[in-house]
């Protein structure tokens, strides 16, 4: 019989950890080697799959070794080729999860079938789906995907549920850097904002030491150790050890006897790395973490004075220079009360306890990292859900058709921050068909975005008249990579002015189309009610606007649009005055022309269909 316990797994880029609730406290489960964390490394040797420390020890010397596979989760088409067989990131991750599951079962003494798995706050829909798939392959029912900073805050906040606090979580792991701002109060954990650098972590600090050792050895002996795989493996291990040593003491001894051979026999590498040298080598890496912190604060609309506590997460936060920088930047002493390698797994175990009912009065509110919406007329990206919106969430908006008797609408689902659809990431496409023939703007198409508790997106479109419905669940091969998220945000900042201009141009074209369409309807209604000269004047102005649009002359289009607008408004006023006079002449009885059923289009966005303000229908 399977255990009713839900284990909490921190599936990390460099290291992973697992914990379980024991009574009221989460407890880290050690691996067979006695380690409290397990390297996220898989190696294949003579048909045998090895995971963890034993795989890490051959990471450079054995070409059939896979590490940092997490950085490829959700990447469409990505595989690793091992001994003629292709493996997806989900399959490699599943091997790590299977290993963790097995030693967790040995500890618990029963079969484990359910887990809570953490992901970086930046993980998008595709990457979250891929993580769930990896769990499924490993034989785990993933009950919840939660953000790593949320999990670590849960670990820190369990004993202080009665206090309202705003917390900054600074998470510098092996391969990625994340910073999140959270609000804790009354047992509710709400993410206010997230930011980070997906190419920055402890591995980069190791590489700085390796480069320093390689350069020094080359200068002294004329031999490039970077070309020697066996030497590189030893250098990698020595660099990681030196980083840890110099984080605890003022200097570290690096001794690698028989590192290679020269013309006169064996050569040895002997070096002393001081903390000051290490700080100098890695200063640029520490500095790179500042801007994401400032960005996260800006997105949360907070200042450092609003932050009550700073939590350090990830093994790389043990580096003294990192701690000093965080203290200097925030003006607060960072909280070290929980092992930074273990906080995420402990928090995941607590969430497992919440799901089984063992932990009471705790609610997690995560956020979506990027805005979601659809493409509307003119190639505009119309957002339905803004980034940093708390999930789970649902948002609906009513649109309409852009042409008379339009039989179908294409729903182009996008994720990103740019105003034009082409500059954002396509998540999926689907079509709502069999729309009954009707004039443009009459059909009511309700588009709904649902994001579940795991951050997975479902989009539906429903014809309000026929109640015909179509929907799409965004699958893993259509998501964004972390790199794309970073690129989008940077592009959005760098191209803000150009984007604004494109958006204004698209809006002008949409307004022009709407005015031309409305003018045709108005002129048809005015026939016989105003003079032919007035009709001709309006028709000439309409033709002039049409020509400016066809010539793509934006300045002329703007001027001609204003001219036509004024003429049509004057004619409409005249029409209403005539109707009012007729009404008075008829003794106050309403005429058939008043309240002609036309809806107010002032708030209409002409989309791939046309947006209708639902309030206008009330």
Curated annotation (Swiss-Prot):
PANTHER family documented for this protein: HEAT SHOCK PROTEIN 70KDA
Gene Ontology molecular function terms on file: ATP binding; ATP-dependent protein folding chaperone; unfolded protein binding
Keyword Phosphoprotein applies: yes
Domain of life, per lineage: Bacteria
Source taxonomy: Bacteria, Bacillati, Bacillota, Bacilli, Lactobacillales
Protein name: Chaperone protein DnaK
Composition bias, Low complexity: 578-593
InterPro entries, sorted: ATPase_NBD, Chaperone_DnaK, Heat_shock_70_CS, HSP70_C_sf, HSP70_peptide-bd_sf, Hsp_70_fam
Regulation: induction: By stress conditions e.g. heat shock.
Pfam family, one: HSP70
Acidic residues composition-biased segments: 603-618
Primary role: Acts as a chaperone.
Residues with the Phosphothreonine modification: 176
């Amino acid at each position: 019989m399977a255990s009713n316990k839900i284990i909490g797994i921190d599936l990390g880029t460099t290291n992973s950890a697992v914990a379980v609730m024991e009574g009221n406290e989460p407890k880290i489960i050690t691996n067979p080697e006695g380690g409290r964390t397990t390297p996220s490394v898989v190696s294949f040797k003579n048909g045998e799959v090895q995971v963890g420390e034993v795989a890490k020890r051959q990471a450079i010397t054995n070409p059939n070794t896979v590490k940092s596979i997490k950085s490829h989760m959700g990447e469409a088409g990505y595989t690793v080729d091992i001994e003629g067989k292709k493996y997806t990131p989900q399959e490699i991750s599943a091997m790590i999860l299977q290993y963790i599951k097995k030693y967790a079962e040995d500890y618990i003494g029963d079969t484990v079938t359910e887990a809570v798995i953490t992901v970086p706050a930046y993980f998008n829909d595709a990457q979250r789906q891929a993580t769930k798939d990896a769990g499924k392959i490993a034989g785990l029912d993933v009950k919840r995907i939660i953000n790593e900073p949320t999990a670590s805050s849960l670990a820190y906040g369990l004993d202080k549920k009665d206090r309202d606090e705003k917390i900054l979580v600074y998470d510098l792991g092996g391969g990625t850097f994340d910073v999140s701002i959270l609000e804790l109060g009354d047992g509710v954990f709400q993410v206010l904002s997230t930011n980070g650098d997906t190419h920055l972590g402890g591995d980069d600090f190791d590489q700085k030491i390796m480069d320093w050792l390689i350069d020094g050895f080359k200068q002294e002996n004329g031999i490039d150790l970077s070309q020697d795989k066996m030497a590189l493996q030893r250098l990698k291990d020595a660099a990681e050890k030196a980083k840890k040593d110099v984080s605890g003491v003022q200097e570290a001894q690096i001794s690698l006897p028989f590192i290679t051979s020269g013309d006169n026999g064996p050569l040895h590498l002997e070096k002393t790395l001081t903390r000051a040298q290490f700080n100098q080598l890695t200063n640029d890496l520490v500095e790179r973490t500042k801007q994401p912190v400032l960005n996260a604060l800006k997105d949360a609309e907070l200042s450092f004075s609003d932050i009550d506590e700073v939590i350090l997460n990830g093994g790389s936060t043990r580096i003294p220079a990192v701690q000093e920088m965080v203290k200097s930047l925030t003006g607060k002493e960072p909280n070290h009360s929980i092992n930074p390698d273990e906080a995420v797994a402990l928090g995941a175990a607590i969430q497992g306890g919440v799901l089984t009912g063992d932990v009471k009065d705790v609610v997690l509110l995560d956020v979506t990292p990027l805005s979601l919406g659809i493409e509307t007329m003119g190639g505009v990206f119309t957002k339905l859900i803004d980034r940093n919106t708390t999930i789970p969430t649902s948002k609906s908006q009513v649109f309409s058709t852009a042409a008379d008797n339009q039989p179908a609408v294409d729903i182009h689902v996008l994720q990103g921050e740019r105003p034009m659809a082409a500059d954002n990431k396509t998540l999926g496409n689907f079509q709502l068909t069999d729309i009954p023939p009707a004039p443009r703007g009459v059909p009511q198409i309700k588009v709904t975005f649902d994001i579940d508790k795991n951050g997975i997106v479902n989009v539906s479109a429903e014809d309000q008249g026929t109640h015909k419905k179509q929907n799409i669940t965004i699958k893993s091969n259509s998501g964004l990579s972390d790199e794309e998220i970073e690129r989008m945000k940077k592009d959005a900042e760098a191209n803000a002015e150009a984007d604004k201009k494109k958006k204004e141009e698209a809006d002008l074209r949409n307004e022009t189309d709407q005015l031309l369409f409305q003018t045709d309807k108005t002129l048809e209604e005015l026939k016989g009610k105003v003079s032919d000269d007035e009709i001709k004047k309006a028709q000439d102005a309409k033709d002039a606007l049409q020509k400016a649009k066809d010539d793509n002359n934006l300045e002329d289009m703007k001027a001609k649009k204003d001219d036509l607008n004024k003429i049509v408004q004057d004619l409409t006023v005249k029409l209403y005055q005539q109707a009012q006079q007729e009404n008075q002449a008829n003794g106050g009885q309403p005429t058939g022309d008043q309240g002609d059923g036309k809806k107010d289009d002032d708030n209409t966005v002409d989309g791939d269909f046309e947006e209708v303000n639902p309030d206008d229908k009330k």
